[in-house]
Amino acid sequence: MACCSTSFCGFPICSTGGTCGSSPCQPTCCQTSCCQPTSIQTSCCQPISIQTSCCQPTSIQTSCCQPTCLQTSGCETGCGIGGSIGYGQVGSSGAVSSRTRWCRPDCRVEGTSLPPCCVVSCTPPSCCQLYYAQASCCRPSYCGQSCCRPACCCQPTCIEPICEPSCCEPTC
């Protein structure tokens, strides 16, 4: 039976044998689809126990977990913490900007299966950061790094990931 162990920014990854905390791990740890019914999800394989509905506060909000850049409805409350939070100071005026929690679907990053979570940023993340965060493309923005890898950069499009040899952001 698949099990989860903590790795890569604290998120669970799939392994075999052992336990997850004090409970046996469930095969749903390795689920790859995003919008699964909450009845088959287990708290054992979730990063936080209250994140059990794949960023969908209610059953009628079914598009929140789809790979779209601008779908924000329901995401602020679906990932465990509602509202926005302060994000330091901007410029010399001392104005405080506001970070918003954007939903990110389930995807593979650095060869690791990650459950759905939220990207916290001041502006809407690009699809590259939000959905196509892959080792060969962009760094995972939810780990505090939003710049692209030097090898290639995904274009911020919701249709298909397009990689180019040059990076849109050469430095972090």
From Swiss-Prot:
Keyword Acetylation: yes
Domain of life: Eukaryota
GO cellular component terms attached to this protein's record: cytosol; keratin filament
Keyword Acetylation listed: yes
InterPro entries per record: KAP
Segments annotated as Sequence repeats: 27-36, 37-46, 47-56, 57-66, 67-76
N-acetylalanine found at: A2
Keywords: Acetylation, Keratin, Repeat
Biological function: The keratin products of mammalian epidermal derivatives such as wool and hair consist of microfibrils embedded in a rigid matrix of other proteins. The matrix proteins include the high-sulfur and high-tyrosine keratins, having molecular weights of 6-20 kDa, whereas the microfibrils contain the larger, low-sulfur keratins (40-56 kDa).
Extra facts: The source of this keratin is lincoln wool.
Protein name, entry field: Keratin, high-sulfur matrix protein, B2A
Biological source species: Ovis aries (Sheep)
